[in-house]
Amino acid sequence: MDKALYEAGLEVRKATLGKEFVENAIASADDFNRPLQEFVTEYCWGACWTRPGLPRKTRSMLNLAMLTALNRPHELKMHLKGALTNGVTREEIREILLQTGVYCGVPAAVDAFRTAKEVFAELDKK
C-alpha cells in the first residue's frame, strides 16, 4: 500500500463523507473486508478524488449519476450526503436525477429520487 496515497484518500474521504462515518467503516472492517476498505481509500479516494482535473463538487455530481445508473441505493445515499457537503445543491441533485431518467431509465430515476427524499428528510430533522 502507498501510505501517502492512502492518507490523502483518507483525508478526502472524511471531508466528503464525514469523519464519523469513515472512522466507523474502517473500525468495523474485519480480516475479510479490510482489504476493500484500504483499496477504496487508497485508489478511489486517494488516486482518483485527489486528482487536479475536476473539483470535488463535479466528482460528486458524476458519482450521483453513475450510482443511479448502477442502481446502488446504499452507495447513492452516502454520496448524496457527500455531494451536499461538496457544495452540490438540492436543485442540482434534482436535475442530475432527472437527466438520469432520460439516459438510464425512469425506474432508476424514481428509485434515486426516493433515496434523495429520504436523505433530505433525514438531514432536515437535524
Positions of the model-derived regions?
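Acidic, glycine/proline-rich low-complexity segments that act as flexible tails and inter-domain linkers
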Residues: 1-57, 85, 110-126
